[in-house]
């Protein structure tokens, strides 16, 4: 036969429309052989080529077939045509047999195997109409239906292990044939040919009777018999294998089921055997089968369900699902759910039928039922267990749950039941719900655990997991922390380097900017607005404090390298190096700087070189944390408290590098000075960034950084503990305030130029200054400083007076004045000790000596202050207000309160400067060097001491503060008095005013405004409060009133004090009615009595001071008595003061009457206003710390 006609062609017929096969005469019916024989005979000799019966199936035959004819194994599936389909079963060599998937090449098609044991079967499908019958499955005859369905849709699937389908193929077929009725041709055809689209469809379309249980050409009986017992009958039976074969591999048939639209499984025709079980049609009446089977059993046009049912065979031997094509098993069901008992026909019960053809695993009908029951039970158990697990998943109690439903409770005991029966079924067998399939049973989980859920891509993950990490924020935070630690932590001499390297990009530029005096620039540039905000706030606060409590003029010369940081040591180094002259200037400034608060230091650091600001720049710019700024402040203070030795070490270690660094910084400072001025001014409106100031900033910065390097946390703690360092910082802020002053700025500019030149020449000096080597810088610088300071003092007296007012406000000023005295003394010592910060101790000792000298006086002053404190405050409230009103009238809107301190100190300093310039530069130098040295010392120690003095002076009477200042003040006052005596006639009023102012300012400054807090403290505090804003005007007016430059200076001072002492001047007039000579003597005596003249400025002046001091005690008592005069005089004074205020220093000197009234008022106020101390005979008050009496000064 041609290859086309062989199984290959047959297989192609499955996929392609059948070629009209050559019609072969039907061979004689094959001897009846059992399916087993057929199955076995497949391996037998092929010696009988004709052994394979050729089944011609025609519609006529199918119609004629009766139940007896059913034995005829001619099966035509959908072969409605009369065309003969002859299945030629040839026995060519086994090797030549075409291989059909699922079909043994050597074996005869199931059911086609004959008794001859045809090993090779060539099936020729003869279809005249192209209707295909499976030759291997049996002649599928003619079927017109075949044509319509089989050409495209017919797929013959042969299962090589068709033995299950074939089981008892011929016999079953014969049975089927016997049972099938001829009533309907469609119904009688047991052969089911699987169609591509719907395996059930072809059969639905096909009339079973038509496709007919056709016997092999021969009697239906023969066919039936052959179907039962003969292989040929079995061979004719195979067409039914098409039915059963669809989707039923003998190995998989029980596990896989024909689903609607499912493609037939190759070789799945296990029922290829002629009457093989696969040929069994689903019974017509098998609707949904009874039992668990929920499958849709379709009659498929079966008219004789009984016949079909009789012939029905389940190849897998279990439930009716065996019908395969007829039975549509829902995808959610399994064969195990089909109840085989519902089948009317049970072919496996036929004698000679191989049970293995129907049941696998050695099961039989009963065992299968048992197995199904076990599966049911197991499914129930697993289902209940799973439910129980779900139910108990949230329960921690593993014990019996009374709320557990009985079913679940019963199933709970079955949890431990082994799933042994599941082993009976291949895992493949599980097609149904996992809950029902034991193989799908999940291992039980201990109760109480959450239900295991397999993660899927679609599941929602926690946002924390899905959220992209924000590394920037983390980095920024970490960076801030690191920066804080780096900046705040000292690392010996490397601290600066580390600080620089901590944020190499930021820190270094900041350092450089600092050193270059660009630091303000860099700082302002680097400072974020938030950074500038704190600085500006600090600066504003500092400015307020400075205006209140610090002398604007005193703004510590930290504008020079000394005072930038306000560090005691750095300022001492620079001021010491600067020399006495520099000290003189700086001393006045430092006195002005009388440290208000550590915040001032912070601001000084901000305005000057505030490392705080620097750290805030670095740390804030880098980390943006204000905490760093605060830490920097502390560190700065600590660093300031570090001794010059450390600084020198730092300089020595870092000198070369620092020199280079300073050079670079100097250049960079110059480049960025303008920007730094802008930024610094932005950050610190008071600060115009004198180059000197910038230099000092840079120097201090370097110095601080070196300190950071060299200074350990302990040193910093010492610095923190050291009030002077904080004072120095505040003084630095004062210095910034001074920088706001034009004179100070000019001086700062001069210094800046000098500093620039020095920076260019000795860039390391900045570091040296910072490292305690400021002495190198200081000598020349202080000379210029002194000059600038002198000019500045002249200009800044009003500011000093303003600041002195703030000093007056605090009784703690007494302490500050003491400190100021000590500071002046220390300054005197400091210009000697400039090179060594450690000499501060000696300065302190000397200050202690001075304090011992002044101790008694201060004790007296304290006693007096305590006694007069309330009266003094009252007097201040009354007369001071009047004076303030007058002074306000004179001075306008100037800051009176802040300038009071400055006025006292500034006026003292100004008078000291002027008198010194005019009369005794030596005395002035004594005063200034003392002041400078003490200001340097204060810058390191006394700055904070002065600041404390200011605060304490504000808290305490001024009398105590006058102690130390009175000495120098008296010295300068003596020289001034000499000049005043010379100019008595011409400048009598001016001198009186000026001297009063000098005495007040100097005493207030030296005494920390504590002595001034005496009699003057009350009146002057009031007047000065009002006068503080007027001081500049007063100075100007003094200039106008001054007949000469000296007189102008005196008049400036005097005017500033005149403004303060408008009422005092009136009193002075009254006192002048007395002998001016007597008043002058009294002044000298009172000055001597004030005890501040521990050192007579001049021999004659010293003597006069001694006499005056001796008289002061008496005068004090007299003044006290006089001060008890009725307040009416005070009011008179106030009225006159107001008038004079309107005159703005054009006030005529008060008449003797007025002065007398004023004296009375003041004398009356004195007991009440302890501050009102010695008053000139003219009414000018000389604040005596101890006696707080008014010394009337009268110039003949």
Swiss-Prot record:
Residues 117-126, 549-561, 643-657, 998-1021 have a biased composition (Polar residues). The lineage of its organism: Eukaryota, Viridiplantae, Streptophyta, Embryophyta, Tracheophyta. Keywords: mRNA processing, Nucleus, Repeat, RNA-binding. A motif (Nuclear localization signal 2) lies at residues 734-741. This is FIP1[V]-like protein. Residues 18-31 have a biased composition (Pro residues). A motif (Nuclear localization signal 1) lies at residues 704-711. Residues 268-278 have a biased composition (Low complexity).
């Amino acid at each position: 036969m041609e290859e086309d006609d062989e199984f290959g062609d047959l297989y192609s017929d499955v996929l392609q429309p059948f070629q009209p096969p050559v019609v072969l005469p039907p061979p004689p019916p094959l001897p009846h052989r059992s399916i087993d024989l057929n199955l076995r005979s497949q391996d037998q000799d092929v010696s009988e080529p004709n052994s394979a019966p050729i089944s011609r199936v025609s519609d006529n035959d199918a119609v004629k077939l009766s139940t007896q004819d059913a034995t005829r194994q001619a099966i035509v599936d959908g072969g409605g045509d009369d065309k003969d389909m002859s299945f030629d079963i040839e026995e060519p060599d086994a090797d030549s047999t075409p291989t059909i998937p699922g079909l043994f090449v050597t074996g005869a098609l199931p059911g086609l195997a004959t008794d001859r044991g045809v090993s090779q079967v060539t099936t020729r499908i003869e279809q005249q109409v192209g209707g295909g019958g499976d030759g291997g499955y049996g002649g599928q005859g003619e079927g017109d239906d075949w044509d319509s369905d089989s050409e495209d849709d017919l797929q013959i699937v042969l299962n090589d292990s068709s033995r299950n389908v074939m089981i008892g193929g011929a016999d079953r077929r014969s049975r089927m044939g016997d049972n099938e009725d001829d009533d309907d041709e469609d119904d009688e055809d047991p052969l089911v040919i699987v169609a591509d689209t719907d395996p059930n469809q072809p059969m639905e379309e096909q009339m079973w009777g038509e496709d007919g249980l056709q016997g092999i050409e021969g009697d239906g009986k023969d066919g039936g018999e052959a179907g039962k017992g003969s292989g040929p009958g079995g061979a004719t039976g195979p067409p039914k294998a098409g039915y059963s074969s669809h989707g039923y591999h003998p190995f998989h048939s029980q596990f896989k089921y024909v689903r609607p639209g499912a493609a037939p499984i190759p070789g799945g025709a296990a029922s290829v055997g002629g009457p093989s079980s696969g040929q069994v049609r689903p019974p017509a009446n098998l609707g949904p089968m009874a039992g668990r089977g929920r499958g849709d059993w379709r009659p498929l046009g079966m008219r004789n369900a009984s016949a079909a049912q009789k012939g029905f065979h389940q190849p897998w031997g279990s439930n009716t699902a065996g019908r395969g094509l007829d039975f549509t098993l829902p995808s959610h069901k399994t064969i195990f759910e089909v109840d085989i008992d519902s089948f009317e026909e049970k072919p496996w019960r036929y004698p000679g039928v191989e049970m293995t053809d129907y049941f696998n695993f050695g099961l039989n009908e009963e065992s299968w039922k048992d197995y199904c029951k076990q599966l049911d039970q197991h499914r129930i158990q697993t289902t209940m267990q799973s439910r129980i697990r779900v139910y108990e998943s949230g329960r921690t109690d593993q014990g019996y749950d009374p709320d557990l439903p009985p079913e679940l409770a019963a199933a709970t005991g079955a949890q431990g039941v082994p799933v042994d029966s599941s082993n009976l079924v291949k895992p493949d067998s599980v097609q149904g719900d996992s809950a029902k399939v034991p193989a799908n049973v999940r291992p039980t989980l201990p109760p109480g655990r959450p239900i295991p859920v397999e993660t899927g891509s679609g599941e929602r993950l926690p946002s924390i997991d899905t959220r992209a990490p924000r590394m920037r924020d983390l980095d920024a935070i970490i960076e801030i922390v690191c920066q804080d630690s780096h900046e705040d932590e000292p690392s010996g001499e490397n601290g600066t380097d580390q600080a620089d390297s901590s944020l190499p990009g930021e820190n270094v530029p900041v350092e450089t900017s600092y050193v270059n005096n660009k630091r303000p620039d860099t700082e302002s540039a680097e400072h974020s607005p938030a950074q500038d905000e704190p600085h500006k706030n600090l600066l504003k606060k500092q400015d307020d404090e400075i205006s209140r409590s610090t002398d604007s003029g005193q703004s510590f010369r930290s504008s020079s390298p000394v005072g930038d940081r306000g560090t005691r040591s750095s300022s001492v180094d620079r001021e010491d190096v600067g020399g006495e002259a520099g000290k003189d200037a700086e001393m006045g400034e430092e006195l002005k700087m009388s440290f208000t608060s550590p915040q001032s230091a912070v601001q000084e650091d901000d305005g000057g070189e505030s490392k705080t600001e620097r750290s805030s720049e670095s740390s804030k710019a880098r980390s943006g944390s204000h905490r760093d700024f605060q830490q920097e402040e502390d560190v700065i203070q600590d660093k300031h408290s570090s001794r010059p030795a450390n600084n020198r070490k730092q300089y020595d270690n870092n000198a070369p590098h620092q020199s280079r660094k300073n050079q670079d910084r100097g250049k960079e400072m110059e480049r960025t000075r303008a920007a730094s001025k802008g930024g610094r001014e932005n950050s610190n409106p008071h600060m115009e960034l004198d180059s000197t100031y910038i230099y000092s900033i840079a120097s201090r910065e370097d110095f601080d950084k070196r300190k950071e390097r060299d200074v350990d946390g302990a040193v910093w703690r010492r610095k923190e503990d050291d009030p002077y360092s904080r004072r120095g910082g505040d003084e630095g802020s004062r210095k910034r305030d001074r920088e706001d002053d034009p004179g100070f700025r000019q001086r700062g500019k001069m210094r800046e130029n000098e500093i620039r030149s020095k920076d260019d020449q000795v860039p390391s000096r900045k570091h040296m200054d910072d490292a305690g080597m400021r002495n190198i810088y200081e000598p020349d610088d202080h000379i210029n400083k002194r000059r600038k300071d002198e000019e500045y003092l002249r200009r800044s007296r009003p500011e000093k007076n303003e600041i002195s007012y703030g000093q007056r406000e605090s009784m703690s000023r007494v302490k500050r004045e003491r400190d100021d005295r000590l500071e002046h003394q220390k300054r005197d010592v400091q210009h000697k000790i400039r090179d060594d910060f450690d000499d501060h101790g000696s300065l302190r000792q000397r200050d202690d000596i001075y304090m011992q000298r002044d101790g008694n006086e201060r004790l007296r002053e304290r006693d007096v202050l305590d006694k007069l404190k309330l009266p003094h405050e009252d007097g201040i409230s009354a007369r001071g207000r009047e004076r303030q009103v007058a002074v306000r009238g004179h001075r306008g809107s100037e800051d009176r309160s802040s300038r009071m301190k400055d006025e006292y100190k500034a006026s003292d300093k100004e008078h000291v400067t002027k008198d010194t310039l005019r009369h005794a530069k030596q005395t002035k130098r004594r005063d200034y060097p003392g002041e400078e040295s003490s200001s340097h010392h204060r810058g390191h120690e006394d700055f904070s001491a002065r600041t404390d003095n200011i605060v304490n002076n504000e808290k305490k009477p001024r009398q105590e503060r006058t102690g130390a200042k009175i000495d120098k003040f008296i010295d300068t006052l003596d020289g001034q008095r000499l000049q005043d005596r010379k100019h008595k006639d011409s400048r009598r009023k001016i001198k009186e005013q000026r001297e009063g102012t000098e005495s007040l300012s100097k005493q207030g400054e030296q005494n920390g405004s504590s002595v001034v807090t005496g009699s003057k403290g009350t009146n002057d505090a009031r007047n000065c409060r009002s006068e503080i804003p007027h001081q500049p005007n007063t100075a100007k007016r003094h200039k106008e009133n001054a007949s000469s430059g000296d007189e102008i200076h005196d008049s400036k001072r005097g005017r500033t004090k005149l403004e303060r002492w408008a009422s005092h001047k009136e009193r002075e007039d009254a006192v002048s009615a007395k002998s001016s000579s007597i008043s002058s003597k009294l002044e000298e005596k009172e000055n001597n009595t004030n005890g501040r003249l521990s050192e007579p400025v001049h021999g004659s002046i010293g003597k006069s001071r001694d006499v005056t001091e001796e008289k002061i005690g008496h005068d004090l008592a007299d003044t006290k008595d006089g001060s008890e005069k009725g307040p009416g005089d005070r009011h008179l004074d106030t009225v006159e003061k107001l008038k004079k205020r309107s005159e703005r220093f054009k006030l005529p000197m008060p008449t003797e009457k007025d002065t007398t009234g004023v004296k009375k008022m003041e004398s009356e106020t004195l007991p009440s206003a302890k501050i009102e101390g010695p008053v000139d005979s003219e009414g000018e008050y000389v604040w005596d710390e101890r006696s707080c009496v008014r010394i009337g000064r009268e110039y003949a």
